Structure formats: C-alpha cells, structure tokens
Amino acid sequence: APSANRLREVLAQALPDLATLQRALNTILRAQTPRFVKKGKRAYYIAIDLTLIPYHGEPYADEKEIVRSQPKSGTTHFHGYATVSIVHDNQRFVVALRFVEKGESMEKIVAWLLNRLKSMGISIKRAYFDKGFCSVPVLKTLERRNIKFIMPIPVRGKSGGVRKLFEALASHKTRYTFNSPKHGELEVSAVVVKKYSKGRYKRKGARWFAYAVAGLPKSVAPHQVFEMYR
C-alpha cells in the first residue's frame, strides 16, 4: 500500500497552488459559519491552533511549503497550518485557516488570523492559543490589540526559564519576563498551576503548568485557568 506521504504527493499534483487553495478553503469556511455568528451581536471565545504534519519526503514544487520545528515523529520538517475557531456551547466552529510557509513568523500568522476575524465582524471575548505561538512578538501583538488571552508557556531545557516558577509550593499568580535576544524583554502576567497526576501525565507525583494571561478577572483562581484552557 502507498505511504501517507506518497498519497499526499499524488493529491498535491491535482490541487491548485497554496494561495489559491487557501482562498478557496476560507471561502468555504466563511459560507459554513453558523448564522448566529454572522449576526455580530456578541463577542466570542476563540481558539487559535497550530497544526504541524510530519513530512519525511522531498519538498514539493515549492520549498516554502515545508517548515521546520521541534523534532516530532522522527523529523523536523512539517507541513503547517493555523486555524482560528469560535468556541460556543462546548463546540468549535473553524472560521479561518492560514497555511504556514517556511520562514514566516508566528506573529504574522496570528495577525493575519485576527484581521480575518475583524473582516468577518467577529469580536473577541477571550483568545486561547496553542503553545506554539508563545513568543515575544506574538505577545506584543496581543498587548497592542488589547486582547484578553490564555497561552501556555512552553517548558524548554532542564533548568532556568519558566522552571523557576515551579519552585513554589503551590499554584499561584505571578509576573514572568520573557527574554528574546532578537525581540527584547517582555513582562507578562502568569498563572502557575500544580496538578497532582494520580497516574496521569505518564508519571507519578505532581506536574506543573504555566500560562501567560491577560485580562483575567482577579477572582479567577489558578486551578480555574487550567480548567478554562482545557
């Protein structure tokens, strides 16, 4: 049987270029947007997700289709796309899609998706982001646009960085400073959550989670942030 990559290669030959395909997909998504959303009478919770599909073959006709990221499934090469969804009554409605091309910044991707929402007349109550978007440029973009959000802070390396927040005895709220050699420093509000695994998370004991947040009511406790993000 042909491999998944081979099937994608065959299908790709029958598809239009990425820009044309993206426009077509977004036209379909817009047409399928629920009627209650189109009324534009309220703000919605939104989720912006990043999907990376492992790629083990040679790049297609356009090298820009292949992006690089942290190792996964034996490769650092991926096809990538980002989506923005409305979260309503425990359901998700994807309203826009953006392909990720080689060399594109997450800041550019996020700005495009937010602008797409604006063009559709959709207001944001709070945004939930994939951890793949956590960076100084993206956080600065959200700050400039005054968007309320919850975004996981990735844990990298074996020491330092966000791990310093895990030295406390319990869940807490604090401030955290991101340091980027290229984009400078940025201090954000952070929520740190300690969860006892009870056999989950593939390990015993406790596991820590950290989130960059903005616009949360003071009454919201750390464990509530964990549940809200789930």
Annotate each language-model stretch with its function.
Residues 103-164:
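Domain-level cores of phosphate- or acyl-group-handling catalytic modules
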Residues 1-3, 42-56, 84, 124-134, ...:
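Short, conserved catalytic/metal-binding motifs centered on acidic residues
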Residues 4, 18, 22, 135, ...:
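Alpha-helix initiation and N-capping motif
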Residues 145-230:
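An anionic, glycine-rich sequence signature occurring as long contiguous blocks
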Residues 19-33, 107-109, 211-229:
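Short, motif-level signal for alpha-helix interfacial/capping segments enriched in acidic residues
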Residues 33-37, 68-74, 139, 177-180, ...:
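A generic local secondary-structure boundary/capping motif
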Residues 66-123, 205-216:
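Electropositive, glycine- and tryptophan-enriched low-complexity nucleic-acid-binding patches
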Residues 8-88:
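Active-site-proximal, Lys/Arg-enriched surface segment
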